[in-house]
Amino acid sequence: WSSLVFASVGAVLALWVNKCDDRNLFVGAERPNSGTSKFRELLSGLAIMKREPKVLVGGIVRVINTTSQFAFVVFMPLYLKDYGIGDTQWASIWGSIFLFNILFNLIFGIVGDHIGWGRTIVWFGGVGCAVSVLLFFYAPVICNNFWFILACGALWCIMLAGYVPLSALVPSLVDKDKGAAVSVLNLGAGLAAFVGPLIVALFRNAIGYVGIVWFMAGLYILSAVMTYCIAPRNR
C-alpha cells in the first residue's frame, strides 16, 4: 500500500507541479501536439537506436548497470545461507545497503560535473562495479561477518550510483530527439529487471553462482569500454 502512495505522489508531481514548459528541458520544438505526433514520437524512440548507434550503446550500458542488482536478489539469499546468513539478516543487508545508493546518486551527479560524465561512469560505474560485485559475493569467504558483508554490499551499491551521469551523457550525444534518447535509457532500466534473473536461470546449472558473478564483472568491464567509446573526450 505504501508503494501506491509513492506512485500517486510521483504522478501529482509529474502532471501538475512540474508541468510548466520552461521547466522541462525536453519540451519545445519536439513537443507533440496531436495523436499523430505522439505516435511519431513513440516511433522516434525506437528509430533513434538505429539512427544514432551511440544511443543504443548507452541503452546497453544502462541494462548492464543494474543487471547485478536483479541477479543478486535471486540467488544471494540462497548462497548466503551456506554461510549461516538467514533470510532476516539478508533482508537487513539488502535494505540497508541501498541507503548508500540513494545518497551517492546525488554525490556522483556532482562528481560527474567536475571530472566528466564519461570518466565517472567508466571508473566508478564500470570498473568500480566489476570489483565491488566480486567483493560482495566473496565477502562471506573473506570474513563471514554480518557487518563486513554489509560493508561490501554498501560499496557495491555506491559503485552502482557511478552510472548516474549516463542520464546526462546519452541525451547529449544527439542534437535532437533528446526525449527519445532518454526513453532508450528507461527501456534499458526496465530490461535489467528481466536480464538479471534470466542470467541466473540460464547459467546457474552450467557455471554456478561463482561463474555468474564473474560473468557480471565482465559485463561491467565491457560497459566501461563501451562508455569510453561513446563519451566525448571533454565529457
Where are the regions that the model predicts?
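Helix-loop junctions on the cytosolic side of multi-pass membrane transporters
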Residues: 14-30, 229-235
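Juxtamembrane intracellular "pre-TM" segments in multi-pass secondary transporters
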Residues: 21-59
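Extracytoplasmic gate region of multi-pass secondary transporters
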Residues: 53-105
